[in-house]
Amino acid sequence: MAESTLRLSVPREGLSAGDVILRFPSLDDVDAMLPAFTDPELREAGNLPAFSREELVASLRELPSLAEAGRLLALAAVHAPADEVVGGGTLHHLDAERKIVEIGYFVLPHARGRGVATTIARMLAEHAFSLGIERVAAYVNVGNTASERVVARAGFTREGVVRSMPKPDGRRVDKTLYSLLPGE
């Protein structure tokens, strides 16, 4: 079978929907994004790794090469009028042969309750479809009702529980699998 040329990419100016822009994070975003990687509650809900400030800087510096390879898109979510970082989103675990990708998202506490997470999830999925993806998956920790509501509002369908999935810290938890197909 021929190797797929499907790659994850995003326009330099990012993606936008309403007043939310998804763009590549810069080193200027470190202080705004750091709580997502240091706050235990945010990390647990978002399946985010623990990063010190220095580790986050190093990670942000590495993102361009990962994006260039076409296998990971990690984007900052910005409230457009103020250029204020409100969260982030990823397209990751690309299976180019089967045209499947996973999404991830987080919203900082000050931006919650405004539909930002749903907007991020929908933007990422629509962008993935524009690249030729045929299935977008979202894994949500069992019991994370806020995130379950996000993916449901974004149009995802609940498929069931996947047992003993790894988290960035090595623990294993059960997750609910949701998916979205083009046209849904």
Regions found by a protein language model. Give the residues of each.
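Conserved GNAT-fold acetyl-CoA-binding loop/helix
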Residues: E41-E62, L73-L75
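A general structural signal marking secondary-structure boundaries and capping sites
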Residues: P40-E41, A67
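A generic secondary-structure signal
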Residues: E62-L63, H127
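Acyl-donor (CoA/ACP) binding surface of acyl/acetyltransferases
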Residues: M1-P40, A74, V78-E184
